[in-house]
């Protein structure tokens, strides 16, 4: 396969059709097209509107708790004996993950568009909680679609959503996971186009969602860049984040894409291994196709039917990936690697024991890769990792596996 030509900037996309190279675009039902174009129009106005930016920054500071800290993991660094490890502490945000950054941005857009009802899809429940949270903050009704399997394994987040006033609709189709929840949300949206805003939680879906979600999440990388320059006087040698749909990863990656000396690694869910179907490594083991309104790498069979992936982490359990990640992989700017369930589980325990931080299973995948790479790097080198969510929601899953349940 011919390598695409290196662009002048890795940060210029998407083009006016929402494409990153051959990926992205907007493949939607005819009934949704006017709404998508309206959304794009509003987004183009909002992102250049100083009033919108000011409101976003104010809510970021006083509601989310930004900037999130940059934390030097001293004991983990000493234990591994190599590169210095810094965490961007997104798990300290209101609601416990990076998801709120995007939700605040999108609900402000929904208000601008005069929408009176919010729908969302969720896997781990973190995006559902963040959507229910902003809907409560702005007084809008909210319906969250969640795969029945995920409802079961993420019970604390289901309860949180209900407490916040959201209606949680379990989806039993397919394997009852994130893909199926997204399908149901899209069906709802087609039926209720006038009143409803679909608050997509990851950097996927039809244009302008991948760009919009990335821009709302890029605050992570922008802050981390400034914070690391203040702490170390230079940029990191390596940036690492877990990738499901890819919003936390693109948020920390994007501001570093044009910095030549910075290597970037996205960590996919390797599940129980890549030889079978029980994983969610769309880039490592998938092929290009169209799902949920955009062209990207997918887990699909020879007939183009979407496979049901598996990950110990509900938030990485998606058979696709954001189109910008697909492009960054093909152009060679970002390296994507799989981490298995058992490796993520070990990393989860390591961080808890050494730093007193209980991470979510999603960033535990990124951490497992950091644990592999840090000892092979020099002590003068720096790794920046996005600690995208806290592990409260996962303690029962982990407890069950480790035989530590009640």
Curated annotation (Swiss-Prot):
Pfam families xref list: PALP
Family annotation (InterPro entries): Trp_synth_b_CS (IPR006653), Trp_synth_beta (IPR006654), Trp_synth_beta/beta-like (IPR023026), TrpB-like_PALP (IPR001926), TrpB-like_PALP_sf (IPR036052)
Coiled-coil annotated spans: none
Catalytic function, reaction form: (1S,2R)-1-C-(indol-3-yl)glycerol 3-phosphate + L-serine = D-glyceraldehyde 3-phosphate + L-tryptophan + H2O
Gene3D superfamilies tied to this protein: 3.40.50.1100
GO cellular component labels: cytoplasm
Residue numbers carrying N6-(pyridoxal phosphate)lysine: 99
Keyword Membrane: no
Keyword Kinase listed: no
Enzyme class per UniProt: lyase
HAMAP family linked to this entry: Trp_synth_beta
Family: Belongs to the TrpB family.
Protein name: Tryptophan synthase beta chain
Organism whose genome encodes this protein: Sinorhizobium fredii (strain NBRC 101917 / NGR234)
Protein's gene: trpB
